[in-house]
């Protein structure tokens, strides 16, 4: 599954879990199961975000490096 889609679906599910936990109509056992699912989901979503942040940092660093190289090259041509 595509990470973007996985993230969106995971976020939606996490929101559903929070709503159910706030409802207070569930048994303790059901609350614990939902809490465990929510924590696992939170961990996975955080991991996806960190991966994407890393990719964005690489892109940003490469763009800055390209910009600096282009600036140096344009200075040499003047």
From Swiss-Prot:
GO terms for cellular component: cytosol; exodeoxyribonuclease VII complex. Its EC number is 3.1.11.6. This is Exodeoxyribonuclease 7 small subunit. It comes from Finegoldia magna (strain ATCC 29328 / DSM 20472 / WAL 2508) (Peptostreptococcus magnus). It is found in: Cytoplasm. Bidirectionally degrades single-stranded DNA into large acid-insoluble oligonucleotides, which are then degraded further into small acid-soluble oligonucleotides. GO terms for biological process: DNA catabolic process. One of its GO terms (molecular function) is exodeoxyribonuclease VII activity. The keyword Nuclease applies. Heterooligomer composed of large and small subunits. Belongs to the XseB family. Transmembrane segments: none annotated. It catalyses: Exonucleolytic cleavage in either 5'- to 3'- or 3'- to 5'-direction to yield nucleoside 5'-phosphates. It is an enzyme of class 3 (hydrolase). The lineage of its organism: Bacteria, Bacillati, Bacillota, Tissierellia, Tissierellales. Disulfide bonds: none annotated. Its main location: cytoplasm. HAMAP family: Exonuc_7_S (MF_00337).
